[in-house]
């Protein structure tokens, strides 16, 4: 299981659904202080939640590192709380790792963005 936030969760979910080896996806919210927030509450930027997609995948077909590459390749990490026309703290870019995968972000494509000189990476 992996969880990513990279903008409006509907588009992010569709992107991950196209990846071979992804079994299922679910959208929701993570972080924040409001228990069981509604979409309307999250969009006020007062709950602290981010829109996320939980990705269930078969590690025999796709690795966490490959999913992380999909994450980096499908959003602009240089704009804070904005992805395309969507703006707000709920549009944060983030990913959550498991104990087994926590070392992977250290060698991820974030470095590719930095080397390309695109500006500050905002997670």
Curated annotation (Swiss-Prot):
Its EC number is 1.8.4.11. The gene is msrA. The keyword Oxidoreductase applies. Coiled coil: none annotated. SUPFAM superfamilies: Peptide methionine sulfoxide reductase. Pfam families: PMSR (PF01625). InterPro entries: Met_Sox_Rdtase_MsrA_dom, Met_Sox_Rdtase_MsrA_sf, MsrA_MetSO_reductase. It catalyses: L-methionyl-[protein] + [thioredoxin]-disulfide + H2O = L-methionyl-(S)-S-oxide-[protein] + [thioredoxin]-dithiol; [thioredoxin]-disulfide + L-methionine + H2O = L-methionine (S)-S-oxide + [thioredoxin]-dithiol. One of its GO terms (molecular function) is peptide-methionine (S)-S-oxide reductase activity. This is Peptide methionine sulfoxide reductase MsrA. Keywords: Oxidoreductase. It comes from Thermoactinomyces vulgaris. Has an important function as a repair enzyme for proteins that have been inactivated by oxidation. Catalyzes the reversible oxidation-reduction of methionine sulfoxide in proteins to methionine. GO terms for biological process: cellular response to oxidative stress; protein modification process. Belongs to the MsrA Met sulfoxide reductase family.
